[in-house]
């Protein structure tokens, strides 16, 4: 395989999964890094990455801002996985290129027709829509 899956069991650790083995160590490091940089996490990771951390602890200890990218289809907002993945990558580029330090500054992001939807966004959930 080209990557090691997190649900692989470790016989040497009593059958503990890779996720559960690394979770405490990664969470401690993650929290230390976030807090040392102002205590705000811009969450652009895919959903399965939450399994790597004690997400409840993360939510309790730092401010999380999650950008979301959705497309209008048939009068409803829908997540199109390939678009969401591409937008997350483009937003990372935007953050680096523009040296974004405040979550509020992400509202200026636009890409391939996706734009900030102020009406449907909150301080912790920034929605960008297409269509």
Question: Language-model features: where?
Answer:
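Internal, well-folded beta-alpha domain core
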Residues: 1-121, 131
């Amino acid at each position: 395989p080209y990557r090691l899956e997190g649900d692989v069991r470790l016989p040497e650790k009593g059958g503990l999964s890779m996720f559960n083995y690394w979770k405490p160590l990664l969470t401690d490091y993650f929290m230390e890094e976030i807090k040392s940089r102002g205590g705000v996490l811009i969450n652009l990771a895919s959903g399965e990455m939450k399994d790597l951390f004690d997400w409840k602890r993360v939510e309790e200890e730092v401010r999380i801002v999650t950008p979301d990218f959705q497309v209008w289809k048939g009068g409803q907002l829908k997540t199109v996985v390939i678009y969401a993945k591409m937008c997350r990558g483009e937003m990372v580029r935007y953050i680096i290129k523009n040296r974004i330090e405040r979550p509020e500054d992400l509202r200026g992001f636009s890409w391939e027709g996706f734009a900030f939807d102020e009406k449907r966004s909150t301080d912790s959930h920034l929605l960008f829509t297409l269509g």
